[in-house]
Amino acid sequence: MSDNYNIQNYINGSFSVSANTEEIKNINPSDSSIINSFKETSIEDVESAIDVAKKSQSKWSKTPAIERASYLKKIAEGIRKNEDEFVRIIVEEQGKIKDLAKGEVQGAANYLDYTAEWARRIEGEIVTSDSPDENIFIFKIPMGVVSGILPWNFPFFLIVRKLAPALVTGNTIVIKASEETSNNAYMFSKLLDEAGVPKGVVNFVYGRGQTVGKLLSSSKKIDMISFTGSVETGSAIMTEAAKNITKVNLELGGKAPALVLADADIDLAVSKIRDARVINSGQVCNCVERVYIDKKIADEFTEKLTKAMQNTKFGNPNTKTDIDYGPLINEDGSKKVSELVNSAKSSGAEILTGGNRDDSSEGIYYHPTVIANCKQDMRIIQEEIFGPVLPLVEFEDLDQAIEYANDSDYGLTSSIFTNNLK
């Protein structure tokens, strides 16, 4: 077990070890080894983080927006200087291939710079009143204290996605990283310290959703909750937030459909759909989760897609670069993928390639999978898979395809492949 990470809370500009005795193990999904363990933030420490964020917010909101933005640029500069280290950490604890992790780190720095520019665009309004000798002034003011609750699939970028808009608009924030990917968040908190961000403006706590996340969702002192993750967790957060009528901003799961019409460039569709399914081992909420194919081209498309998935390489991203994807995040994720694939098979679907976990390595890997003869009411079509699995459904015409695509409890994205947008 590595001692490289000694995760500590970052509260009021200081690092401190939690008094909690509950420890969480951080597992490398590529080989199932223990990277490190850390103490879950105690109830008292979470409450302290919220309190200092509350106390710091008034002064921070009065700081000129352009000055607030300058801290975002300093953080972005720090990210770029430490890019290689952040990439290494993300690959190690989350299982991304190196190129994807590098893109995430670079995207985070770019997003900070982009958000900093909004300091010049925080504007109010003067509205002419219906009453004489009166004008209406509209001011944009900060929400107050934001809690940012992060997912594990893009753990680094989502830090800045929560932090940057909050800070530039005069809010303070308490961030909880996923317990699966806390090391990159801890290293990020060190950047904040080096950038000189005022004490109490940004605070980091660590732990499970059922404990630390619940506190950040139920506190009366939190003015807004920003969460990215599963529908189930989002629903639980809404339940807690409703008790105080706290504003929530939720980005939840997805079941993105891809429609392949008869006039589509089949090779292009195969390439894009394959890439969109295996990116981050299929653990991306807005990438293809189900494919609808016109019956007239179904045989050709299915054959080419199956070959493309058979040629897809996976492996340990810590040691290999010639791979398309790495491991699933944990055993629970692997079990969910297996359960949905097995359910489809038992309901009459046909596994054309893959359909099982790779047992030849110690990591958590799942073979690239294509499943034909799926029906619209199957669980694998209706539920989020979050793995390198492509279920296929054939359709008669565009109206039926659109009906199928819209028959979902999820939102987010969709795609269509055609050479005739009319």
Model-derived segments and spans:
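Residue-level signal for inorganic ion chemistry
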Residues: 13, 32, 68, 90, ...
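Short, well-ordered beta-strand elements within core beta-sheets of diverse protein domains
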Residues: 35-41, 56-62, 147-148, 258-261, ...
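Conserved C-terminal structural/oligomerization subdomain of aldehyde/semialdehyde dehydrogenase
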Residues: 31-37, 222, 357-358, 365-422
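Rossmann-like NAD(P) dinucleotide-binding subdomain of oxidoreductase/dehydrogenase enzymes
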Residues: 125-268, 322, 395
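Structural signal for hydrophobic packing residues in well-ordered secondary-structure cores
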Residues: 57, 61, 76-83, 87, ...
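Glycine-rich loop-to-alpha-helix module at the N-terminal edge of alpha/beta enzyme cores
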Residues: 33-122, 133
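ALDH superfamily catalytic-core signature
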Residues: 224, 232-375, 398-399
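Terminal low-complexity tails and localization/encapsulation signals of metabolic enzymes
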Residues: 1-37, 70, 74, 124-147, ...
